[in-house]
Amino acid sequence: MYVSRLQLQDFRIYRSLNLALPPGVCLFYGANAAGKTTILEALYYLATTRSLRASVERELIALEAAGDLGLPPFARLAASLQPQPEAEMQTIEIVLQRKFGADGDLAPTTSKTIRINKIARRALDLIGQLRVVMFAPQDLELVTGAPAERRRYLDVTLSQIDGRYVRALSRYNQVLTQRNGLLRTSRERGRAASEQDLAFWDEELAKAGVYVLRERRRAVTTLDQLAQRLYAEISGSDLDLRLNYLDTTPAHDVPSFQAALKQLRREERERGVTLIGPHRDDLSIQLAEREVGSFGSRGQQRASTLALRLAEAELMHSRTGDRPVLLLDDLLSELDQKRREHLLTTIVRPQQQTLITATDLDDFSPNFLSQITRMHVDHGLIFPA
């Protein structure tokens, strides 16, 4: 799969963009704040419905945006996808729109409209239409950050591979909110939630949670093997990079998940929160049996995150038969020459679309530059180089 065209309207710095993209490697270069990262962010948003940088979605809508015919301001993102060389072109689109409040002023909330081949669909239906793997400087948080970062890594990867996973995860989070609300309000009112109510939510949580757990464990088994090989190639080190899924319950089916919840009934009532499940799990990332985030050098941490991202791409390819689009955001400037050359060699593959951003061309060899498409970005304008 590759993205043949990207269209943006009032998305961050881009008032109007209609950009044709090549199927191979494309380098966007220019000064900081020129709009390079926004290209990658737009594709990531179209693939996952999540923003990499915005804390609230209204930040994605350009300040200068104006609605049509009295409508509130909106941003539009659309991409044309070529799944296979002989396959029919597909289109995906997101329209993100501000809302008017009761007083007629703009409210802080937004609405989101999603279309696939011009037909309105749900957000869950969009995920997996376009598969991407994002490499970014903040990827170090995968090994140094909180467990939520590593859970997100697994969830974003699996959601793009498996439509059932994204639905199970969504259902799990919905049930978790309801169950936590029941526990919390019961504690605040000093009145225990009924066993019947909790048993109902236990079963619903277990039904969704067991699938999430099973797929995460299965993915980590494969990612462990892939990342071990890739780390050795990237670093040239004989240290083993190992991944291990750290679950808060060993449950493998609905009854065992329910039993684990029931064992914690008293403590959960006292604390007003669900204490076990996929939302509490973690991913252990170790070199020579020591956590990379705590004991690894900066170089080891960076090589580990690269191995994780490349493993993510290989997992997507092996599960779907389709190579994801690779998005590399100003990453090469942080790598030494050896790792930079290895990464560039790795990503230049047939049927592998790769979009790279950089501030200048000094990080790339003349031979590499001769094989790719270059585009210069300057304050929201893009020029072929």
UniProtKB/Swiss-Prot annotation:
Binding, ATP: 30-37
GO cellular component terms attached to this protein's record: cytoplasm
InterPro entries: AAA+_ATPase, DNA-binding_RecF, DNA-binding_RecF_CS, P-loop_NTPase, RecF/RecN/SMC_N, RecF_2
Keywords of this entry: ATP-binding, Cytoplasm, DNA damage, DNA repair, DNA replication, DNA-binding, Nucleotide-binding, SOS response
One Pfam family it belongs to: SMC_N
Any one Gene Ontology molecular-function term assigned to this protein's record: single-stranded DNA binding
Main location class: cytoplasm
GO biological process, one term: DNA replication
Location in or out of the cell: Cytoplasm
Family stated for the protein in its record: Belongs to the RecF family.
Function: The RecF protein is involved in DNA metabolism; it is required for DNA replication and normal SOS inducibility. RecF binds preferentially to single-stranded, linear DNA. It also seems to bind ATP.
PANTHER family recorded: DNA REPLICATION AND REPAIR PROTEIN RECF (PTHR32182:SF0)
HAMAP family: RecF
Name of the protein: DNA replication and repair protein RecF
Gene that encodes it: recF
